[in-house]
Every structure is written in structure tokens, then in C-alpha cells.
Design a protein with these regions (language model features):
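Short, acidic/polar
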Residues: 26-38, 81-96, 146-156, 229-237
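Conserved, mostly hydrophobic/aromatic
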Residues: 6, 18, 38, 46, ...
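Active-site groove signature of glycoside hydrolases
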Residues: 92-115
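A short, structured active-site edge motif that brings together acidic residues
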Residues: 69-80, 102-106, 166-170
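Beta/alpha (TIM)-barrel catalytic core signal, keyed to glycine-rich beta->alpha loops juxtaposed to Asp/Glu
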Residues: 108-291
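N-terminal binding-site loop/beta-alpha segment at the start of enzyme catalytic domains
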Residues: 1-70, 126
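Alpha-helical scaffolding within the catalytic cores
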Residues: 1-4, 56-58, 87-90, 148-152, ...
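Acidic (Asp/Glu)-rich catalytic clusters
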Residues: 7-10, 40, 60-68, 89-98, ...
Length: 291
């Protein structure tokens, strides 16, 4: 498993981050199997969130065994300081740890959300206090939607977040406005030496409506690629960008083996683009969705 430097934090993390959303609504057996598969493949960054159902509890059963050899991150999606502070403490209890390596402000995808989180008595203040108390090692920000890169650029101008997690994939890069926002964010990330993490790598499109034969086969809110060739190409394309520290694995345990295999089966960016440009139904996930 390739490792890359997580910005100024200096930590060399696996390029695949295990996404705890995959554990939100599955059995302990499926959770354990997926976590072990990731560990065996060399994944050492495990991410979750307070909003991911039982994910923190599923992680918590493993922490006694693996905490000292992984980078652990979680998120708070609350915007008010006191509520976020309570949620941070609850997350630590659910994870069965004294601290996490990274706490992220969750789903900050537009300026209204950013204003609430970064304003007086916002969740950013709770995160800063938690860091001062040794409960979290670093502070990051995440978000979905077309406005995420521009919002995260503004966030970095307001506060030196250690990491940014934002959407990036081949189809998003074909939107000139989105690409321009992403490239501006990358410049600021590099200037501040922050870590850049990516989501929506294997998103194919929104789930089709009204077709029972093409229903929601996975727990992801978008329809993912699930042919190995397409997964290989999507992962390869994202990891061909040197600014990307790593990518979050998709939110379904059944996709874990394919993404682990894709990290091993790299193709060039040009090869990946040839495959993805022919992928049927490939479109932005941010169409008619609440982000």
C-alpha cells in the first residue's frame, strides 16, 4: 500500500482511508471482515463520524488491538459549540479511546454552514478547545456538493485547518467551474501545507429512479462503480494527482475488496481517462441531491 505525507502533520498515511460510513448499517461480522481486509492490505487511516450510525461503536471494538498503529479520525456535524463539544466526548466514549488524531467539521459544503461552524460559539471553537485539551491531535474540514471546494478555500482563509476532505473525480474535473474551484483550493492547500483527502472517487451517478432492476444495491447514497475495471480507473485517476494525500473508500463493505484491489492495479491517468470516458451513465453525483 502506497503511503503519502499528510501535509504539515508529517504523518505518512495509506493512500486509501477506510471510510466508516461503510459500517453504519451492517453486522459485526461484516464490519470485522472489512476492517481486517483493510488492515491486511496496509490501510492505516481509519475515518468515521458521529453521524455514521453504529460506525464508531464498530471501530471501538477494535481499538484495544489496533489504536497504536492507525491514524484515527472522526467528525462532528453539529454547528453549535456546546452541542459539538458534547458530541466530541460522546464519540470518544463510543470509540473507546482517550483521543483521536483528527477531528473534522462534517459536511460543511456552503458558506452558510461555514459561517455557522466558524462563527462565535460555533463548532470550530469546540474543536479548538478539544485540541487544547489533548482530545484531538488536529482539526480538519469536510464537505459535499458543487460548492465544497470554494467553501473549503474560504475555510482555509479563516482558519488553518490541518486537513481538507473534498469531492474529486474524473467526471467532476470535466466541469470547468468545478475544476477551477478545485485548482484554487489545491493552491491554498499547498501554500498552507495542509493534507488533501478526496471523496466520491468511485461515484458513477445518482441512483436511477423508477427502475426496479437497477435499484439501490449498495448502502451508498450514489450509485458506485462496481466493475473492477471502472473502479481501477477511478482510483488510479484520483491517485495520479500528486496533491492528493489519499481517498476515502466508499460507504459499503461490499466495495472494500474492489477498492483495495484497485490500489494495487494502477493504470496511468491517460489509461484511466480512456476507460472512464467510455463508462455508461457516468455523471456528477451532485445533481438533484440535497448538498
Amino acid at each position: 500500500m502506497e503511503h503519502r505525507r499528510l501535509g504539515r502533520l508529517g504523518r505518512e498515511n495509506s493512500v486509501l482511508t477506510f471510510g466508516g460510513a461503510a459500517l453504519s448499517e451492517t453486522t459485526e461480522g461484516n464490519s470485522d471482515r472489512a476492517i481486517q481486509q483493510a488492515l491486511d492490505a496496509g490501510v492505516d487511516h481509519f475515518d468515521t463520524a458521529a453521524d455514521y450510525g453504529d460506525s464508531e461503536l464498530q471501530y471501538g471494538r477494535w481499538m484495544g488491538e489496533i489504536r497504536d498503529r492507525i491514524f484515527l479520525s472522526t467528525k462532528t456535524g453539529l454547528r453549535e459549540k456546546d452541542a459539538a463539544k458534547r458530541q466530541i466526548h460522546a464519540s470518544l466514549e463510543r470509540l473507546r479511546v482517550d483521543n483521536v488524531d483528527l477531528l473534522q467539521l462534517h459536511a460543511v459544503g456552503d458558506l452558510e454552514d461555514l459561517d455557522r461552524a466558524s462563527g462565535p460559539d460555533g463548532s470550530l471553537e469546540a474543536a479548538i478547545e478539544a485540541k487544547e485539551e489533548g482530545l484531538v491531535g488536529a482539526i480538519g474540514i469536510t464537505g459535499h456538493g458543487n460548492g465544497a471546494p470554494a467553501t473549503h478555500l474560504e475555510a482555509l482563509r479563516r482558519y488553518p485547518f490541518d486537513t481538507v476532505l473534498t469531492p474529486w473525480n474524473y467526471i467532476l474535473s470535466t466541469d470547468e467551474h468545478y475544476r477551477a474551484d478545485y485548482e484554487a483550493l489545491v493552491e491554498e492547500v499547498k501554500s498552507q501545507d495542509a493534507g488533501l483527502l478526496v471523496i466520491k472517487t468511485i461515484s458513477r451517478r445518482n441512483w436511477p429512479e423508477g427502475d426496479p432492476l437497477d435499484g439501490q444495491r449498495y448502502a451508498t447514497w450514489y450509485e458506485p462503480f462496481d466493475r473492477q475495471e471502472h473502479v481501477d480507473a477511478a482510483v488510479s485517476w484520483v491517485l495520479s494527482h500528486d496533491e492528493v494525500t489519499g481517498l476515502a473508500m466508499a460507504g459499503d463493505v461490499n466495495l472494500v475488496p474492489m477498492m483495495l484491489e484497485a490500489e494495487r492495479r494502477r493504470m496511468t491517468r491517460e489509461e484511466a481517462e480512456r476507460v472512464l470516458s467510455r463508462a455508461p451513465g457516468y455523471s456528477s453525483p451532485f445533481v438533484s441531491v440535497p448538498f
